């Protein structure tokens, strides 16, 4: 079964993999996430990147604080991302390609049983 058209909206997702890389072009460090969503009973993978350099992206700081992934020394433990579900907002760009516009930690009561993997 194939998904022919993924509708824009909010889906339940989990972090499948992550890595950190420094861009050769900009010199900035990025957290690259592979997020798997449950769309109509099928698993679909998306990529989402966050800049980790100071002052560049407050969104990832909020996510890491929500998953208790920041210690007293302000070091991030990205492994804690694996322990949570996320609300993944999918929209389409001008070229008609779906992408993640927003990623938020889902509270336990926000995750429906049929959305679990």
Identify the function of each model-found stretch.
Residues 1-117:
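Short beta-rich binding modules
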